[in-house]
Amino acid sequence: MAMVLENSSAELLRALAHLSNKRGNFKDGAALKCAVELGIPDVIQKHGKPAMTLSELTAALPIKQSKAHCINRIMRVLVNAGFFVEQRSGDGKRDDEEESYALTPACRLLLKDEPLNARAHVLFTLDPAEMVALGSLSEWLQDDYPTAFETANGKNYWDYIAERPARNKLFNEALAVDSRLIATVLISEFKFVFEGLTSLVDVGGGTGTIARAIAETFPNMKCIVLDLQQVVEDADLEGTENLEFVAGDMFEKIPNANAILLKMVLHDWSDEDCVRILKNCKRVIPEKEKGGKIILIELVLGGQNKDHVTVEAEICMDMEMLASFGGKERTEKEWAKLFQDAGLSGYKVFSNLDSRCVIEVYP
């Protein structure tokens, strides 16, 4: 109590507001999930006008009209979170003027027709199983389960989604969207990383978005996508003359190649598991002098000139890895230790992809 009394009223109110905001951040996510599931961004986009009034919006949504009066409260949260802009039908001076809503650039990433839409990512990260895992951290810290996800759901993440085809599909869709963005940047900015290679294995490559882009850019390179049996079968994937899909387990065996590509794979795993994966990669590539290398696309925590939004995104991603996978985001020092423990000779970090970096690791 003495500590509280030492602070001014203004400081206490700011502290309380800060606590309330952080405690309530998950409510932004809940409102966002609701908007995506109801298709609110698409309804407003298809309206054909710069903004859509609240009454027009509620009439167009697939909801019980007896609950239509609640939509403005959900929209209020989303406006405050920066996903919509609220406008007034008149000059904004009268209280009875009806609200109308327009999309922000962030909201356009939630449109179904947007090639790089983030709908799947929103839905799978805000899945109840994910949220209850985050809410079980204190219990997990006191039990014997490897992850909070297992504490909350009774099984690990991979077994959980393997038993739920729709959830597994959503996960792979989210990865594919992310890969489309990364593939564009890789080919335009980091083409030199792949030049001279005759073969490459994309480990955990999912539906092959990145490998397909690489194979098209380098028609003389043989590209293989390695992923679990259910991923390869469920996606009904077709290869091309220089692109092949192989079902397998990176912990067991990886096909031989000049280079191995791992995009946002290692952050899902513990240090011990990462060392196992890297050692398996090292076994199937030639020595450095003959062009052998492992290509990582991963977050590298820390560094200079990162804005608050980027740092917050990195921290939140690390918390997700902690709760659901038992993995982690890593600093450059932590990456270097992993490479050393796996018996790799060196590495080079190239210009980053926002938070993520391209890292070449050598046998």
Swiss-Prot record:
Keywords: Methyltransferase, S-adenosyl-L-methionine, Transferase
Residues reported in the UniProt entry to bind S-adenosyl-L-methionine: G204, D227, D249, M250, K263
InterPro entries: COMT-like, O_MeTrfase_dom, Plant_O-MeTrfase_dimerisation, SAM-dependent_MTases_sf, WH-like_DNA-bd_sf, WH_DNA-bd_sf
Enzyme Commission number(s): 2.1.1.397
CDD domains, per the entry: AdoMet_MTases
Pfam families named among the record's database cross-references: Dimerisation, Methyltransf_2
Pathway recorded for this protein: Alkaloid biosynthesis
One GO-annotated biological process of the protein: alkaloid biosynthetic process
Catalytic residues in the record: H267
Any one Gene Ontology molecular-function term assigned to this protein's record: protein dimerization activity
Protein name: Strychnine O-methyltransferase
Gene source species: Strychnos nux-vomica (Poison nut)
Gene that encodes it: OMT
